[in-house]
Amino acid sequence: MAYRKLGRDSAHRKAMLREMTTQLIMNERIVTTETRAKEIRKTTEKMITLGKRGDLSARRKAAAFVRNEIADIHEEKDAVVVKSALQKLFSDIAPRYKDRNGGYTRMYKLATPRKGDAAPMVIIELV
């Protein structure tokens, strides 16, 4: 499988992709550079496909990749409900795309490049 090196060694690149994929699942929209977004798109699509499968093996594979972070905290009837990024993937995001075969993300190019190095910036979001 082809991939971009993104100017990092393999461990740093994998950690960055895991972190940014988790952030996209939690926030459903992030701003990043165009090349990073193209790589994040691949991993996010795979995680959502695993979420749609929903069996134990898919949950374990997704749990191995998605970081264990808190996605949402809210109160329900005198109880505080804490939802992790993995729970959000399987309970909120995957059912939303049950009738859709791929193409779960959308990228918008921003008009202004990044200030320091003029890197092209995009907004990547879940459809």
Curated annotation (Swiss-Prot):
Domain of life: Bacteria
A cellular component annotation (GO) from this entry: cytosolic large ribosomal subunit
Subunit structure: Part of the 50S ribosomal subunit. Contacts protein L32.
Lipoprotein as UniProt keyword: no
Biological process per Gene Ontology, one example term: translation
Native source organism of the sequence: Lactobacillus gasseri (strain ATCC 33323 / DSM 20243 / BCRC 14619 / CIP 102991 / JCM 1131 / KCTC 3163 / NCIMB 11718 / NCTC 13722 / AM63)
InterPro entries registered for this protein in UniProt: Ribosomal_bL17 (IPR000456), Ribosomal_bL17_CS (IPR047859), Ribosomal_bL17_sf (IPR036373)
SUPFAM superfamilies named among the record's database cross-references: Prokaryotic ribosomal protein L17
Protein name according to UniProt: Large ribosomal subunit protein bL17
PANTHER family per record: LARGE RIBOSOMAL SUBUNIT PROTEIN BL17M (PTHR14413:SF16), RIBOSOMAL PROTEIN L17 (PTHR14413)
Record keyword Ribosomal protein present: yes
Gene Ontology MF: a single term: structural constituent of ribosome
Family: Belongs to the bacterial ribosomal protein bL17 family.
Keywords attached to this entry: Ribonucleoprotein, Ribosomal protein
Gene that specifies this protein: rplQ
